[in-house]
Design a protein with these regions (language model features):
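Active-site core segments that coordinate phosphate-bearing ligands/cofactors
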Residues: 2-18, 27-38, 42-45, 60, ...
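Short beta-strands and strand-loop turn motifs
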Residues: 19-22, 48
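A generic secondary-structure micro-motif detector
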Residues: 26-27, 54
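A conserved helix-loop-beta module that forms one wall/lid of the active-site cleft
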Residues: 45-56
Length: 225
């Protein structure tokens, strides 16, 4: 049972491994002990020998084999490190490599996270924890499903006229929509958008949640949404 990057490592090196950060997203890792949870494996009926060995993200876990070198053009013997999960790599990419630093990602989805010396176990289960690329740190996280995806949905479903206009002007539709949104006063005239197009995760996990606009009125203009 391998994550995507771990399968790539296997093809390059022949080693069946993963790192703590990616493993922490499987819900099978005891993140405080940095080992697979015997209790959870037993609960789900998963044999331990089906799971990869665990290493820190920066650990060299193998070298590129002769076969992989022939198939990829890479140099045989090149060291390969365990790497990290996407969220934990984004954390380091944002410069969050010390306790107390925070960051926000706005992509297709979005999340807010921080580097912490210990995991934050929320009794209401609104958030979750990754292991940081630095195995001495954690990244408690709250995440939403449709951030940039909401913007794309609005462009595709509600902005046919703007798409044509942007094409005529030779600019990206998002650039035109940005100019339009800048004309709306702060607060968008009281219009509120709930971005639950794909259900929602934090703070109340609900796959059946659906999005809506709240506060529509006769004074609402296209620039507001």
């Amino acid at each position: 049972m391998l994550n995507a990057k771990d399968y790539m490592i296997y093809r390059l090196t022949g080693e069946i491994v993963t790192d703590y950060s990616d493993a922490s997203g499987t819900n099978l890792l005891d993140i405080t002990q940095k080992k697979w949870s015997d209790e959870l494996l037993e609960c789900f009926g998963i044999e331990r020998n089906l799971l990869p060995e665990l290493y820190p993200s920066s650990k060299i876990v193998g070298i590129i084999t002769e076969e992989a070198a022939r198939e990829t053009g890479l140099t045989a013997g090149t060291p390969v490190v365990a790497g990290g999960g996407d969220g934990s790599c984004a954390c380091v990419g944002a410069g969050v490599a010390a306790e107390g630093k925070t960051y926000c990602v706005l992509g297709s989805s979005s999340w807010i996270s921080a580097a912490a010396a210990k995991p934050f176990f929320d009794e209401a289960r609104r958030t979750f924890n990754w292991v940081h690329l630095d195995p001495e740190l954690y990244t408690p996280c709250g995440t939403m499903q449709a951030a940039g995806l909401s913007y794309k949905w609005i462009r595709d479903v509600m902005c046919g006229e703007e798409r044509k206009e942007a094409k005529f002007m030779g600019i990206d539709t998002y650039e035109l929509l940005g100019h339009l949104a800048a004309l709306s006063p702060p607060g968008a005239g009281g219009l509120l958008y709930l971005p639950y197009l794909l259900g929602e995760r934090s703070p109340r996990w609900n796959s059946d949640a659906r999005g809506c606009f709240v506060g529509l009125g006769m004074s609402t203009e296209k620039k507001d949404r």
